Structures are given as structure tokens and as C-alpha cells.
Amino acid sequence: MSSPSSQEPAASRRAVSAIELAALLRPEIAELTAYVPHDPPGIRIKLDANEAPPSASPAIREAVVRAVSGVAFERYPDPRATRLKEAISRRTGADTAALLLGVGSDEVISLLLTALARPRDRAPQPVVLTPTPTFAMYRLSARGHGHKPVEVPLDATWDLDVAMTKRAIEMTRPNIVFLASPNNPTGNRYTKERLREVVAADSSVFSVIDEAYVDYADGSLRAWREELPTVGFLRTLSKIGVAALRVGWLEADPALVEEIDKIRLPYNLSTVAQAAATAVLEEAWEDVQRDVAAAVARRAGLVREIAALPGFVVTPSDANFLWVKTPGPAAPVFDALVADGILVRSFHASGGRLAAQLRITIGTETENDALVASLRRIAR
């Protein structure tokens, strides 16, 4: 004779099991919403994701194809990514022992949050401190890893409020401070004096300067590590034309890198990604830099065009995108652009001073011209 439980419909048993398993979730994870990019139909020009447009030179693609053609697909990747680290070292000056590589900088952020997670001073949970607005993954990843996110508003010029930030560091004793410079979404680089004062405020805090967009700015600040050993630098290849490879890295004190590397999943970077990224760095870097220089030139032109529109204000940019204040709420401008087949990033849902802000990626000349023409119609 079958038991009552065996007579229950399978769907019912699955539902009960799912409810029981949901009880195992940490509350902060249950409260999160998965990141889903906005992808409305009819879009012909995507200027929302800070991706570089296709290269004007075939050399980058050709170098990648050559490198990938020699991959032994039946073998696991090099777990230490030796050749890629050496290529990064030659391009940046970083010691290979100071490099921690990940699947984009997102994985490196996750590794940092996993490793540097011991609560301080009898606190119930570790703390991550960031400015706001900034890269959303800091907050999302922090919550997912059980850290308490603390956010300090940027000042009226989208620069660091040093006094408020130092006070927050003193009061909350964070494990990690994330500082994107150039910042996403505002596009500007923080004033060097302010940034240095913040990262030097507490030597027991690990400060991460995220230089994802530094190729579009006036050079890295990585030399600071010589005097500030508790500062690390994040970099990525995603913003300079090879986002598909998903290669990022941290440069930090080798002793810390050695500890964090213990929890990095083996073979995290595929052989294809390693070979392709190495080829870009070794064989096509001059072409990449020409593409970056061309984007910077187009950025200057786009700033002039948009700033000339009545009521539009453009924050000076050190990245491959613009932070644009609209004459009124950003939502109607965003919707009108979508109706024209142009997708940008709107922050109207964030409210407050962000409700009038758009983030617009620098596109090709043709894409930028179409954007400006659309904005002119909207501004009438």
C-alpha cells in the first residue's frame, strides 16, 4: 500500500520543496532583484552599455582569430594564466605576482568580497563603502556576499565629498572602499587630491580604485601602490573593444593576492579568453589605442553638440560615455529616444537629482549624428 506522501502530485511535492529550500536563502539575497538589461524592441543604435564600437582596424580581430586557431580545445586552461599575466605586466608595469585575474572585473570584485569578509570590531557583518552614484555591482555584490553597503553621496560636481567620506570610514570601519575613477555613471575622474586623501584615511581598510575607463583618461594612478600598500587597482579589457572576452584584473600587494587566489576557482579564465586577450595586448595594442584616441576625439565633438542644446548640461567626461542632465525629467527624453530607435541609460527611476540624468555611450560618427539629430527634435 502506498504512503499518502507518494500519492501527492509531483508538482505539489516540487512546490513544497522549493518553499523549503527558499527558507535556506540569506534574507539579503531573497530581497535582491536580478540584473536584467533593458532591451526594448526596435532599437537600431545601442548607446547604453559603454561598449566600444567595432574597431576601424581589422588587426584586432585578425590577431584574436590567429590566437584562437591554435587553442587545444581538449585541454583545460592554464590555471595561472601565465602568458596573459606576462602580457598585462608588459603593458602596465605591474609585477605578475601582484595580479589577480578574473572573468571581468565583476569576478574580481566577488573574490574580494568573499575573502575580505571578517566583521570588524564586533560588528554583526562586514561593511563595504562606496560613493553614490557609482557602479551598481559594488552594492549588489556586497549584499549578495553578506556585506552591509554604506553609500556616501557625491558633491554637487559629482566629486568626492572628502569630509563626509572620511567621517563614514571612521564611523562604519568598512572592510573595503570601492572608488571608480573615472566613475560610472558620472564619467568624471575624482580630483586626485581628494581621492588620495580618502584612500589614505585608514590603512586598515582595503581601498580599491576601479580604473575600468582609465584608457580614456590621462593615465593610471597605479604608482600610488608604492606608498599606499592597502590600495589596489581594478582594470578590464571590456571597455576598449573586446568585452566579449570578459577579462579583468586586480593589481594589489602580492601577499594579499596570494591569499585571495586561494579561493579563485581553478580554470576561471578559458583558454580562448586567455589566448585572445594575450594577442590583443601583444599584437594589436597600437590599434586598440588608436581606437581609444578616436573615441576621445568623437567624445569632444559630442560634448559640444549636446551642450549647445537648450537646457542640456554635460559633465566633463574622462570615459567613453557622457553624463547628461536633461532640461526636465529624463524619462520623456529617454522614451523619445527609444521611439527613434536609440537606447541610452536613464536614471529617472533612482529619483532625486538622478531623475534628470542620462548616461550616453560614445558611438560611431554615424550613431552620434543620429543621436544629436534626435535630441535636437526633442529639445524643440
Language model features: what each stretch is:
Residues S2-Q7, A339-D340, G351-R380:
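PLP-dependent enzyme catalytic core of the Aspartate aminotransferase-like
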Residues S2-R75, E86, R90, R173:
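N-terminal "arm"/small-domain region of PLP-dependent enzymes with the aminotransferase-like
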Residues P9, A72-S204, Y213-L228, G232:
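Conserved core of the PLP fold type I
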Residues P27-I29, A34, P316-S317, V324, ...:
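Conserved PLP cofactor-binding pocket of PLP-dependent enzymes
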Residues S57, T230-A308, V313-V314:
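PLP-dependent aminotransferase class I/II
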Residues L154, A295-V296, I306-D340:
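Conserved PLP-binding catalytic core of the aspartate aminotransferase-like
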Residues A252, V324-G328, I362-T364:
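Short beta-strand-to-loop capping motifs
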